[in-house]
Amino acid sequence: MATGKIIQVIGAVVDVEFPQDAVPKVYDALEVENGAEKLVLEVQQQLGGGIVRCIAMGSSDGLRRGLNVNNLDHPIEVPVGKATLGRIMNVLGEPIDMKGDIGEEERWAIHRAAPSYEELSNSQELLETGIKVIDLMCPFAKGGKVGLFGGAGVGKTVNMMELIRNIAIEHSGYSVFAGVGERTREGNDFYHEMTDSNVIDKVSLVYGQMNEPPGNRLRVALTGLTMAEKFRDEGRDVLLFVDNIYRYTLAGTEVSALLGRMPSAVGYQPTLAEEMGVLQERITSTKTGSITSVQAVYVPADDLTDPSPATTFAHLDATVVLSRQIASLGIYPAVDPLDSTSRQLDPLVVGQEHYDVARGVQSILQRYQELKDIIAILGMDELSEEDKLVVSRARKIQRFLSQPFFVAEVFTGSPGKYVALKDTIRGFKGIMEGEYDHLPEQAFYMVGSIDEVVEKAKKL
């Protein structure tokens, strides 16, 4: 084990000098001896002359020049396997839930090669989520990648929590949750929500929160992914939730300038596409098992053309776009049915009926969108009878796309609903064909299946 000395500290970036014949490799983990505190550094660059530039996986407070640094001769390694279920860990795989050691049988390095082309599998199986708007408009594939796009406060984390709850209870698989640069309060709420739903023993939680140094936020997604890869390689279907992928990019931006790189567009790191690719290419399904991933993506200033969300788009099978305009109408989940897409929405995958209903719903909502200007200027009375019918059905569809969530029961006061895909299709097909034209709009708001609409209408 070679020993070096710190020669420079700038924020989260630390330069260490080693003997010329014992220079650490890129991505090797180094350990700083700083009293009782042990700090791990990760080598990013070799500057020549035995000097390496590293990122600190923790606070660099209290570091000074001349401190001894040991090379561990391997990348950061984290515990994997069943011992991690029900536990909360940090970027280094250390427990932070005060429940003692993890007691793992195996540790894996967080930097791994993506599976080779021969190992990949192509699945067309659908994953039912029980959320009407998602199952109908942007269905998820088992082993696919899904992005939840939205600005601040439109419900990315709540949607994510509902998906985890539904999938854990209805499909009883293992999940890994990587909290990347999100609020500590949300991490706490999330843990208690999982405990209350009795699914905590099927979830591994890895947190690198907002208040932590950029090194933690940059690597915590890889820690969570490594745990998910272990479950996949055991032949399981595992779910990987990342909240929030934008903070992963942002952490890279924070350290990029300190590492001496020139910034690119909007101040992002020049290696943005490569960093995203390294992470996303590992999130994939092989012939032994599958990783289905759901990633929340913060959209800065609601601008989907920002380099960070734009780079993420390229890697996804389905995109769920949350809209501030729909949220302001009080319709939750605030998914935009015209903006959200999925590769699975194909008659060969979902079947002709599902495809026709989804496209029919989109065309009615699109027509309503076009008529809104006329209604705003001239009023409803100036529309033709046919257009009045379209508007009436569109407003019912819009309300029927809302749904009470299990994880939001505390706020809404109404019990959550899980709606099977066949009931979702039946409901929207009925609205489009005019079977429910006689029912009032309010009956369609915040309910589960179409049968509940009929019941609710009787009480109104």
Curated annotation (Swiss-Prot):
It holds the Pfam family ATP-synt_ab. Keywords: ATP synthesis, ATP-binding, Cell inner membrane, Cell membrane, CF(1), Hydrogen ion transport, Ion transport, Membrane, Nucleotide-binding, Translocase, Transport. Its EC number is 7.1.2.2. GO terms for molecular function: ATP binding; ATP hydrolysis activity; proton-transporting ATP synthase activity, rotational mechanism. PROSITE patterns: ATPASE_ALPHA_BETA. The keyword Nucleotide-binding applies. It is a peripheral membrane protein. One of its GO terms (cellular component) is plasma membrane. It catalyses: ATP + H2O + 4 H(+)(in) = ADP + phosphate + 5 H(+)(out). It is an enzyme of class 7 (translocase). It is found in: Cell inner membrane. ATP binds at residues 150-157. Belongs to the ATPase alpha/beta chains family. F-type ATPases have 2 components, CF(1) - the catalytic core - and CF(0) - the membrane proton channel. CF(1) has five subunits: alpha(3), beta(3), gamma(1), delta(1), epsilon(1). CF(0) has three main subunits: a(1), b(2) and c(9-12). The alpha and beta chains form an alternating ring which encloses part of the gamma chain. CF(1) is attached to CF(0) by a central stalk formed by the gamma and epsilon chains, while a peripheral stalk is formed by the delta and b chains. Produces ATP from ADP in the presence of a proton gradient across the membrane. The catalytic sites are hosted primarily by the beta subunits. This is ATP synthase subunit beta. It comes from Pectobacterium carotovorum subsp. carotovorum (strain PC1).
